[in-house]
């Protein structure tokens, strides 16, 4: 994945109470992605992968794919993915309005090198993608298709199909609808369910 945010400053638009918490408690709080303004995007990403895999499959493989996705989404839908949103844009009117208490909040500048140290072994910093073409060319697509067509999972790399789907679910949090593209978003993403395994 692209790290075009590396070495740059990242900006977090928020209210004064969040600023107090960040400074006073020396903490960054992540939100459950399903509680954010783009909660449907995770399911949309999974459906995009499903649709792409189904193209060109036999009827039996098509049914197997849909059954597998239904089972996996049922397993994962309550697994939390937490994120904190940043932007590459320092002074963006839309984000002031949307995230900084209608322009009466703050825009905090963060150093990416320090954020990477904070996130090490606990969370990832990922650029957000706004196009489904990226999702349609994702590695998950080929891994799941290989499982559907050949019953194969690279056990050394992944262990089993559940691990591939868990990773796919986590990645779904960095895909958003193209209407948000102007935000130039980068996210810290944490997966507590993945840390347990």
Residues covered by each model-derived region:
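Partner-binding and oligomerization surfaces adjacent to conserved cores of proteins
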Residues: 1-197
């Amino acid at each position: 994945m692209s790290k075009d945010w590396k070495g740059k400053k990242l900006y977090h638009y928020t209210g004064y109470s969040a600023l107090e918490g960040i400074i006073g408690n020396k903490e960054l709080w992540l939100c459950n992605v399903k509680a954010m303004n783009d909660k449907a995007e995770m399911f949309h990403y999974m459906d995009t992968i499903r649709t792409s895999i189904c193209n060109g499959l036999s009827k039996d493989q098509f049914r197997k794919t849909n059954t597998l996705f239904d089972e996996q989404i049922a397993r994962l839908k309550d697994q939390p993915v937490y994120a904190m949103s940043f932007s590459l844009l320092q002074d963006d009117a839309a984000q002031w309005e949307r995230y900084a208490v209608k322009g009466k909040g703050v825009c905090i500048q963060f150093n990416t090198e320090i954020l990477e140290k904070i996130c090490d072994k606990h969370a990832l910093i990922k650029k957000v993608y706004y196009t489904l073409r990226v999702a349609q060319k994702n590695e998950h697509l080929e891994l799941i298709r290989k499982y559907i067509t050949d019953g194969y999972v690279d056990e050394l790399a992944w262990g089993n199909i559940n691990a591939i789907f868990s990773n796919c679910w986590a990645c779904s949090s960095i895909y958003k609808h193209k209407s948000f593209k102007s935000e130039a978003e980068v996210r810290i993403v944490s997966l507590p369910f993945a840390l347990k395994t």
